[in-house]
Design a protein with these regions (language model features):
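Small/polar (Gly/Ser/Thr/Ala-rich) solvent-exposed segments
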Residues: 64-78, 93-115, 119, 123-157, ...
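Outer-membrane beta-barrel architecture
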Residues: 85, 123, 302-305, 340-342
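Bacterial Sec-dependent N-terminal signal peptides
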Residues: 1-22
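Bacterial Sec-pathway N-terminal export signals of envelope proteins
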Residues: 17-79, 129, 133-137, 143-145, ...
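Periplasmic alpha-helical coiled-coil/stalk elements that build and connect Gram-negative outer-membrane
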Residues: 152-278, 385
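Membrane-embedded alpha-helical bundles of multi-pass transporters/translocases
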Residues: 57-60, 87, 97-99, 117-123, ...
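Amphipathic alpha-helical coiled-coil segments
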Residues: 29, 41-42, 46-56, 158-184, ...
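Metallo-beta-lactamase
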Residues: 228, 287, 364
């Protein structure tokens, strides 16, 4: 089992070994942001999206190609065919190309005949309908760019989720630590009281039965402390789930560690809740809403591509031909021209694909409306909870004041020998 103690925990964070065993909330969140595996996985997804963008841009890379075929049999040279050149794809499906051909042989296909010195060509191919305004490589590049933004939004969403769970674990650790400290104080006070009762019994000022009552209180306090210790141990182990090193090695939190003492004073600065404005909150700025919008944008690119595929394929190509030593004379009467036309008669595949893409868009839009409504309701619920907690805090503060007054009064009565024992 790979576990590390407190000294290593601070060494990873470049903190001095002489530092106290208090772990501040800000330091803890910094560790989670940097080293938690789920946050690192989200970072890898951004890197993968960037790699996909690089691949999509590769579809527009110029290409060099060459093809050579030669056949000889029975002392006869049937044919020798060579074709080499380059292609430059552009944004709107237009391709520029150029190259050199040199073919010869006794059984050469007549359409492949070239001059003795070979044949240069330079040309262009243009898709007039399908593939002009949008084609597969254009769609892939657009989606890859959108996917970068989608990955960033999902990374932010994942990081927020991890930090939220980590903060809850820290607060739970803080609560259980304070509870354990409180019951430890209760136990010490009960033991002091038991010792005092026994002394009074020995002096004849108290009945022996009073020690039984005091001992029951001690045992109850000891039981409360043991239960609080169990809760604290569980909270500490839960907190350890969020502590990792840079090499993805888990860190076990030591028992000597304790949460930040002044957390209540600093928590608003750590979480920037002073600048939180829930009244004019816009759901469009939420990373989950942004992620869904990016998904819809990607499906919209697919929809445009599928709609374009309903058009006929009409590709026009033109090549300027010339001998190598006459290429700059621009004899435009020497050329090769072609037209390619194709269209499915029923377009069932294309229509079905377009319909499916439209349904995916509608599904995402329904999900978007649901998420917006759910998010707004959650915000309203949080606002109501915050207001209620503020009222409860005020009431508890008043209770503390009243109990403090009662304590002072009981201390006076105790000094006079009239206080009740409870």
């Amino acid at each position: 089992m790979k576990t590390f103690y407190l000294l290593f925990f601070f060494a990873v964070n470049f903190v001095s070994a002489q530092k106290t065993s208090e772990m501040s909330f800000n330091e803890y969140l910094g560790m989670v942001k940097k080293f938690h595996p789920l946050v690192k996985i989200a970072d890898l997804e951004i890197s993968q999206a960037q790699a996909n963008l690089l691949m999509a841009r590769g579809a527009f890379d110029p290409k060099l190609e060459a093809n050579f075929n030669n056949k000889e049999f029975g002392d006869k040279k049937y044919f020798s065919v060579f074709n080499g050149g380059f292609k430059i794809p552009t944004w709107y499906g237009i391709e520029f190309k150029g190259g050199f051909e040199s073919n010869e042989g006794s059984f050469l296909n007549p359409q492949n005949n070239t001059p003795t010195d070979g044949l240069n060509y330079a040309g262009i191919s243009i898709p007039l309908l399908q593939g002009f305004l949008i084609n597969q490589r254009m769609a892939d590049l657009r989606k890859a760019k959108i996917n970068i933004n989608l990955s960033v939004a999902e990374r932010k969403l994942q990081a927020i989720h991890v930090l939220h769970q980590a903060a809850i674990s820290y607060f739970n650790w803080k609560k259980n630590y304070e509870e354990f400290t409180l019951y430890d104080t209760y136990l010490k006070n009960a033991e002091i009281r038991l010792t005092g009762i026994k002394t009074l019994i020995e002096q004849g000022d108290k009945a022996a039965i009073d020690s039984v009552e005091a001992n029951i209180i001690v045992k109850n306090r000891r039981l409360n402390k043991e239960d609080a210790l169990l809760k604290l141990t569980k909270a500490r182990l839960e907190l350890s789930n969020f502590l990792w090193t840079n090499n993805a090695v888990p860190i076990e939190l030591e028992e000597t560690m304790y949460p930040e003492i002044n957390l209540f004073k600093n928590i608003q600065d750590y979480l920037n809740t002073n600048e939180l404005n829930l009244i004019n909150f816009q759901t469009e700025n939420h990373p989950k809403i942004n992620a869904i919008n990016y998904k819809i944008n990607m499906f919209e690119v697919d929809r445009k591509l599928k709609a374009n595929q309903l058009l006929p394929t009409v590709d026009v190509g033109y090549n300027y031909l010339s001998n190598p030593n006459q290429f700059q004379e621009f004899r435009f009467q020497d050329y090769k021209f072609g037209v390619n036309f194709a269209i499915p008669l029923f377009l069932r595949k294309e229509r079905g694909s377009l319909k499916l893409t439209k349904q995916k868009i509608e599904s995402e839009k329904f999900g978007l409306r649901f998420e917006k409504e759910q998010l707004m309701n959650k915000i309203e619920s949080q606002k109501a909870e915050i207001q209620s907690l503020k009222k409860q805090e005020d009431l508890i503060t008043d209770l503390v004041k009243d109990n403090s007054t009662l304590l002072i009064s009981e201390e006076r009565l105790f000094n006079m020998g009239e206080s009740s024992l409870f």
